[in-house]
Amino acid sequence: MRLSRSHCRHPTFLAAVFVVVACAPPNEMAVDDRVEAVARGRADPRDDERSRAGEEPEIQRGRALVLTHACAACHSAVFDPAADGYLAGIRTVAEEITIEGFKTRPRNITPDNETGIGRFSERQIFNALRFGLRPGETPDVEITSNIPGKGNFPARPKYLAPPMPWPTWRHMADQDLWDIAAYLKRAVKPVKHRVADSEGPPDFWASHWTKRIGSHPAPSFPTANEVAGASGDDQVQRGRALVIHHACGDCHGGVDNPSADGWLVGARTETDTFQIGPLVTRARNLTPDLETGLGKFTERQIFNALRYGLSPSATPDVEITSMTPGSGNFPAQPRYLAPPMPWPAWRHMTDQQLRDVAAYLKRGLKPVKNKVIDSQHPPDFWASTYTIQAIGPYPASPFPTANEKVP
């Protein structure tokens, strides 16, 4: 899958520029055998600094999901970061996403009636998230089937443009998606900003979505290269849910050349690249293969990569207690993960969630040998103002952002 973007969406660099938000430990909960229920329980903001007094619980949960799933990475402007730019869509042609010849222009998802999603009901937004159906071309009805022409599913469906990750969200609980819809409709201020329509070949949807869905395993264990016995490990099961829901397979699944052992094995072909400005990124092999994957790294090194964006191959196996280079075991000259790795969005996740992800990658997958060519970027890429701008789409705690409503 070739995705080209002429700016850096994810601030996966310059960690010292911002402060990571400390997250309260999650409440204990029984592990449900339904993957989606596990992930939903771990995503709740609880009573930590992300919550706001007097706000409905569904909006708090919806905000947490919108933040940790990096919705702002596509749906917020970076080159023209206005105070009201959060979730208001792209502002320049440079922010287009190109996948296999299809030009996607992320939409304004604030509740503006004219240019955003204000004219759609929460049910229509839910249907968009659950089934990938464009809300403007789908009636406000309950859909009970995903087969065209049945159960109110449109006979000729019009789908949302990629990289909208709705195929991964088919494994999420309905309540999660209702919570996101509630947050977008009720907690975000409307911003009037019209985004041009996406453009692409007429047969794009059938070919692309068939491959995309193939990169996302079903909730039941195992896929071809998962460890069957790991389904009994509560921590691994929670981590698996998070990996699926956060669309890790979109980049690390090797979509251009899917095979029986292709889950999370990284880029397989030369076209499995992400072009972001001057950077060419190839998603790495995340299986625990000792030679070509994560096998030689500890769970703590993987955690440090997820929490701080530090390359595990250039970071020792130590506890890090500071975000300041040279302090608290943070490397004096840090080497960061290449975008579009969304770890900045994960600063709103708990440490336990990220440890769960690390456990799944180390203990829940079979090693698959697949050597990925190194990413390419100019020497001054990380330190440029080009990367500093990318911090804008991720609001910090406490809330609100400039264009969120205050209860």
Question: Where are the model-predicted features located?
Answer:
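Aromatic- and charge-enriched surface segment that lines or borders ligand/interaction sites
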Residues: G116-L133, G293-L310
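Flexible coil segments in periplasmic/lumen-exposed cytochrome c-class electron-transfer proteins
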Residues: D32-S51, S76-T104, R134-D234, R240, ...
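Hydrophobic alpha-helical positions that pack around
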Residues: I109, L286
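Local sequence-structure signature of Cys/Sec-based thiol-disulfide redox active-site neighborhoods
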Residues: Q60-H69, R240-H246
